[in-house]
Every structure is written in structure tokens, then in C-alpha cells.
Amino acid sequence: MNNNDIEYNAPSEIKYIDVVNTYDLEEEASKVVPHGGFNYIAGASGDEWTKRANDRAWKHKLLYPRLAQDVEAPDTSTEILGHKIKAPFIMAPIAAHGLAHTTKEAGTARAVSEFGTIMSISAYSGATFEEISEGLNGGPRWFQIYMAKDDQQNRDILDEAKSDGATAIILTADSTVSGNRDRDVKNKFVYPFGMPIVQRYLRGTAEGMSLNNIYGASKQKISPRDIEEIAGHSGLPVFVKGIQHPEDADMAIKRGASGIWVSNHGARQLYEAPGSFDTLPAIAERVNKRVPIVFDSGVRRGEHVAKALASGADVVALGRPVLFGLALGGWQGAYSVLDYFQKDLTRVMQLTGSQNVEDLKGLDLFDNPYGYEY
């Protein structure tokens, strides 16, 4: 999409979809989402090596089948920060759901609420707090902040999020500038609609702006003090998102973080960074259960959820697959994806002898000496 486009025609159909696997959803979504919007959602930095590394990293550790473990009807439910959720996954904060469907974040929110897990609301949402809240219908929500340069604007946004019902804040700290996203550059991509939550600090509403313009209006000089100030002002638990190094996890906890979010931003930021799953074990070891860990980047199967939990995560966050489901069927399509993950995880739990989520966290993994080519 470019500035000459008059109208962005996102899909609008609402229907449940059949999900065989989430990889196929990407190709299906490419047929219904406008070219620029699809490539914004699906794309990553550079030639997308790190996106491929996110997928290949799962092959570095394998699951042992376990026999005669006295397991039947595994229980996928768990709890994080006092929220009981149906399965150990939540919705990741993603900008601009309206690229995938006309219902925007409100559609995703309804799917998340109907399923029974937590919605992470992005500051770069194309919908208002009120619209998203209507979709959630009382369901739990966390709020992800991209910081403004003006601290008072940050405080105002945090106050609004808290008034809206947010029970935790996610500080995305890995995006002080945009990654070099080749697809968006080639497409001359600009956002076709506004970002009402952060338009107060943009030079405009975000409509017609590029990602570089938007990141340029946000705070680049994020410091440990910002973690302290967000926690102190909001009075809410703060997750620091974008952690890929154990020392950063340790710093965040010491400066007041109540949770660590292991993520490489879906491979959309630093090019030639490690596959996100490869970084998780060392971070979990350093965290040593002091605070909960959320993991994202590359989760596509029930096996991936199981491996992440066995490697130290408490829950995982789902991103692109849910948006592809939204594109293909609105809230019902997004719900179908969440339902697929639960059913796939239940199957994995049965085959690994895991009656509940705590059993998953205790699984031993096989270190694959052959790597991806095994």
C-alpha cells in the first residue's frame, strides 16, 4: 500500500475456520488481505533470516514420548498474576489488527475473551480502548506501551489503560527504532488508519504514516529508570518485553519488573538475532523463578508451547497465527486458532505423559545434536 491508495479493503467475513496447522493459515490469509497489509503482518527484518531462525530453533530441543504415565484428559488450564486462563497462552500485543479485518482489535478481543485467556492491547492499536473493551466484554487485559518522549504523556496513557481495566503493563523495550523491514520498504507501506491511543504524541493520527515515522515520534532513550517509573506510577505489575539476554532480565527484575517477556519481536527488529527459543533456557536460569516469564516469537504448534514451558516459560504469547485467523474469519476465525492450539497442546500432553501444565514445566527435553537438519 502507498499514499496513492484511497481505501484499504480489509476482509470482513465472520466464520469459524478449519485449522489443520497454523503454517497454512499464512498462505490462506495472503489471498484475502491486501498486499501491503499482509506483508506488514507477515514480514520481518532484512531477508527474514531471524524469522526462519525462530522456526528452526524448535528443532534444537525435542520432546520425549512417555509411556504408561497414568494420564487421561489433560488439563491445560493455568494461572498467571492471579488470572485463571483456559490454556498456557495469551494474545501478544500486535499493532494494527485492522490490516487483517474490519473489526480491528475488537474482533481479536472477542475471540480472546470467548476462549478464556488474556488480551494484550498494543499502544499502536487501530481501535480505541472503548472499542476493544466492548469486544472483551469484561475479559482480562494487559496494556503494552510504546513510550512517548514526554513523560507526562506516558503517565496519561498509563492512567487511561488502568481506568480501562488493564491489570499489567508491558513495556516494549526492543523497539526504540524500527527494524529494517524489507517488505515494508519495497511496498512503501503506510498505515491506512489512525492509532487513537498514541495519536497525542504522533505528528498526526498515524494514518498515512510509515513505521519509521511512528517510531521516530516515540522515545528512543529507554533506561532502567523507565521501568521503575512505569511500575511506580501505574501501581501495576510490569513485564519488560524484548528480553533476549540474561543480563537484561536480571537488570529488569532489579529495577522493578514483575515479569520477563522473552521475545525478538517476531524477528521484526534486530536482524541476525538468535532464534528466540534458543535464548529462553539461559534467561530462565538467570530469572530462577523470581518472576513469571512470558515467551513469544515463532510459536506455531502445541509442541512449541510444551517446549517453551519445559524450558522455563510460564505462558507463551501468540501473534501472527491469531491475526491470520482473524483475517480468514473475524473473531470466529481467531477463536478457531486459539481452539486449535489448545487441542494440539492437549494431544502433546497426552503423548508426553503430562496431566497438567506443571507436568509440562517439568518435562526433560532431548538436546538434538543434529540441529535443524535432523
Curated annotation (Swiss-Prot):
Keywords in alphabetical order: Flavoprotein, FMN, Metal-binding, Nucleotide-binding, Oxidoreductase, Pyruvate
Domain (FMN hydroxy acid dehydrogenase) ranges: 14-370
Binding site for pyruvate: Y40, Y146, R181, Y215, H265, R268
Coiled-coil annotated spans: none
InterPro entries assigned to the protein according to its UniProt record, in alphabetical order: Aldolase_TIM (IPR013785), Alpha-hydoxy_acid_DH_FMN (IPR012133), FMN-dep_DH (IPR000262), FMN_HAD (IPR037396), FMN_hydac_DH_AS (IPR008259), L_lactate_ox (IPR014080)
Pfam families assigned: FMN_dh
Biotechnological applications listed in the UniProt record: Is widely used in biosensors to measure the lactate concentration in blood and other tissues.
Activity regulation description: L-lactate oxidation is competitively inhibited by glycolate, D-lactate, oxalate and 2-hydroxybutanoate.
Site, Is suggested to participate in control of opening/closing motions of the active-site lid in A.viridans LOX: residue positions: Y215
Annotated effect of mutating Y191L: 12-fold decrease in activity and 3-fold decrease in affinity for (L)-lactate
Effect of mutating Y191A: 18-fold decrease in activity and 92-fold decrease in affinity for (L)-lactate
EC class name: oxidoreductase
Similarity-based family: Belongs to the FMN-dependent alpha-hydroxy acid dehydrogenase family.
Subunit structure: Homotetramer.
Additional facts recorded: The proposed reaction pathway consists of two half-reactions, in which FMN is first reduced by L-lactate to become subsequently reoxidized by O2.
PANTHER family registered for this protein in UniProt: 2-HYDROXYACID OXIDASE 1, S -2-HYDROXY-ACID OXIDASE-RELATED
Protein name: L-lactate oxidase
Lineage: Bacteria, Bacillati, Bacillota, Bacilli, Lactobacillales
